[in-house]
Design a protein with these regions (language model features):
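A short SAM/SAH-binding and catalytic strip from SAM-dependent methyltransferases
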Residues: 94-107
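C-terminal helical/coil "lid" or tail adjacent to the Rossmann-like core of SAM-dependent
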Residues: 178-233
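Short alpha-helix
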Residues: 159-173
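Class I SAM-dependent methyltransferase SAM/SAH-binding core
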Residues: 35-84, 109
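Conserved class I S-adenosyl-L-methionine
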Residues: 1-34, 45-49, 66-69, 123-148
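A short acidic, Gly/Pro-enriched loop at the edge of an enzyme's catalytic core
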Residues: 83-94
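A short glycine-rich, Lys/Arg-flanked "PGG" loop and its adjoining helix->strand segment in the class I
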Residues: 108-123
């Protein structure tokens, strides 16, 4: 049931991910000469934007296909998981991450690694799914799968914490939380709508099913969600909630 990523599908159905990253990039406030790690860089769209500031940027991603897409942009990218970074100690001024951390299974190992690679005074700037993120989608998807005797384990696909719980977790790993916020962000989906969203962001679950059952589950999930998330013109809006934070490593 491992989630997989196809760069072309992601660009088609998930363009809103880099497209709605302006605010977290402002929080990062990258400067020329800084060395920055883009954790979960995907196809490298945001990595390239950070590099355009004059910062020296290295991307890391666990998906071989996404790593290849990012490298095609001329970006330096390492293929690795967030829980085991192939980087030296205290070598980055900042670690940046957008729409990735809620996919990380071992949050504690990830935080230890981020702290290890940051210089004293370095900052961890990230946006991820927060408490309540895609709640309607998740409930509908689970309900439809249960109807077809495939309850699965939707609850372990993603981790959507509250600001309070995540701030505590960061502090337990030696970070000082400078700023953290939970932000409701209704998100217009691509022209492919909920069908495309499910095929992209729940591919790990769907691809484990027989094709006929997969298509049935997609169709029934879309039908169940349409009254709440599709407007009269057929446009879909995802019920996104983002958790955004800046956490720093104390000097000395």
């Amino acid at each position: 049931m491992m989630q997989t990523w196809d760069p072309r599908t992601y660009e088609k159905n998930g363009a809103f991910v880099p497209g709605m990253a302006n605010e977290i990039l402002q929080w990062l406030d990258a400067a020329a000469g800084e060395r920055i790690l883009d954790l979960g860089c995907g196809d490298g769209q945001l990595t390239a934007r950070i590099a355009a500031t004059g910062a020296s940027v290295v991307g890391v991603d666990a998906s071989p296909t996404m790593v290849a897409a990012a490298r095609a942009r001329g970006i330096e990218v390492l293929e690795a998981s967030a829980e085991s970074l192939p980087c030296g100690d205290a070598c980055f001024d900042a670690v940046f991450s957008n729409a990735v951390l809620h996919w990380v299974r071992d949050q504690d190992a990830m935080m230890d690694e981020v702290r290890r690679v940051l210089k004293p005074g370095g900052r961890f700037v990230a946006e991820m799914g927060g408490h309540g993120n895609v709640a309607a989608i998740s409930v509908a998807f689970s309900a439809v799968r249960a109807r077809h005797a495939d309850p699965g384990s939707e609850d372990v696909l993603n981790y959507y914490p509250t600001p309070q719980s995540y701030a505590l977790r960061l502090s337990q790993h030696g970070f000082h939380v400078d700023r953290i916020a939970l932000i409701p962000r209704p998100t217009p989906l691509a022209a492919s709508g909920m069908d495309g969203w499910l095929r992209t962001f729940r591919s790990g679950v769907l691809n484990s099913l027989p094709e006929e059952l997969r298509e049935t589950i997609i169709a029934e999930t879309c039908a169940l969600l349409a009254p709440a998330l599709r407007d009269e013109n057929g446009n879909w809006t995802g019920d996104y909630v983002r958790l955004r934070f800046i956490a720093t490593i104390p000097n000395g």
